[in-house]
């Protein structure tokens, strides 16, 4: 059996593509929930398509939101 070589398109960072965004805010829980799995883990760059700069800012924002109890640490 031969495997077909399919090239996947590189995902574009949603924060870089949106020129109107100012910064990633830890109080915007609805936006942060898109980057957290159903188990409560932060999704990696290769899945979300974020650039390194915005992935780091997103991680800090999620951790801050968890610390002040806006988001849960885990979901059971």
From Swiss-Prot:
GO molecular function, one term: small ribosomal subunit rRNA binding
Protein name: Small ribosomal subunit protein bS18
Record-linked PANTHER family: 30S RIBOSOMAL PROTEIN S18, SMALL RIBOSOMAL SUBUNIT PROTEIN BS18M
Function: Binds as a heterodimer with protein bS6 to the central domain of the 16S rRNA, where it helps stabilize the platform of the 30S subunit.
Family listed: Belongs to the bacterial ribosomal protein bS18 family.
Keywords for the protein's UniProt record, in alphabetical order: Ribonucleoprotein, Ribosomal protein, RNA-binding, rRNA-binding
One of the GO biological process terms: translation
Cross-referenced PROSITE patterns: RIBOSOMAL_S18
Organism: Lachnoclostridium phytofermentans (strain ATCC 700394 / DSM 18823 / ISDg) (Clostridium phytofermentans)
Database matches in InterPro entries: Ribosomal_bS18 (IPR001648), Ribosomal_bS18_CS (IPR018275), Ribosomal_bS18_sf (IPR036870)
UniProt keyword Ribonucleoprotein present: yes
GO cellular component: cytosolic small ribosomal subunit
Keyword field contains RNA-binding: yes
Taxonomic lineage of the native organism: Bacteria, Bacillati, Bacillota, Clostridia, Lachnospirales
Complex and partners: Part of the 30S ribosomal subunit. Forms a tight heterodimer with protein bS6.
